[in-house]
Amino acid sequence: MTRTSDKAPTQRQLRVGEEIRHALAEVFERGTVRDPAVAGVALTVTEVRISPDLRNATVFLVRLGGGPLDEVLTGLRKARAFLRREVAIRIHTKFVPDLRFESDPSFDYAEYINGLLHRPEVARDLGVPPSGEDDGDDEADDEDDDGGEEGPGAAAPPPADEGR
């Protein structure tokens, strides 16, 4: 009987993953990793996915400011034992999972989608002026600018005289 990876993570997996994420973020913030490929590089731990048995963890990273992450990942893989010890000091679990480091593709994908949404063809289809073009009007909506206020804070019109 094997578990499938389709299942959503349990609360325990999520909690332990967050603890590991915070612990690694603290280690990276302090700059205690001495590998030259990692030293001085600002990293963000975006997510930690942990296996159901809590023995393996995949750590997803992004380099702040962009740039290639290949050399940094190689350095982190070399420093895996050191990082595992640092995590063990900071979290209190029976076992500390084996750490695997990967680049987080979600930010690149979000940038790709954002680029698609800002293409002139898409803006035309949506009826939105393409970015960078301005109609020269700073008012959001000035079609009936009669000085009257509308909305929740506006005064109600006077009641009509009925029967007088």
From Swiss-Prot:
A single Gene Ontology CC term: cytosol
Main location: cytoplasm
Key words, A-Z: Cytoplasm, Ribosome biogenesis
Annotated signal sequence range: none
Biased composition (Pro residues): 155-164
A GO term, aspect molecular function: ribosomal small subunit binding
One annotated GO biological process: maturation of SSU-rRNA
Reported function: One of several proteins that assist in the late maturation steps of the functional core of the 30S ribosomal subunit. Associates with free 30S ribosomal subunits (but not with 30S subunits that are part of 70S ribosomes or polysomes). Required for efficient processing of 16S rRNA. May interact with the 5'-terminal helix region of 16S rRNA.
Family: Belongs to the RbfA family.
Name of this protein: Ribosome-binding factor A
Organism: Rhodospirillum rubrum (strain ATCC 11170 / ATH 1.1.1 / DSM 467 / LMG 4362 / NCIMB 8255 / S1)
Lineage per the UniProt record: Bacteria, Pseudomonadati, Pseudomonadota, Alphaproteobacteria, Rhodospirillales
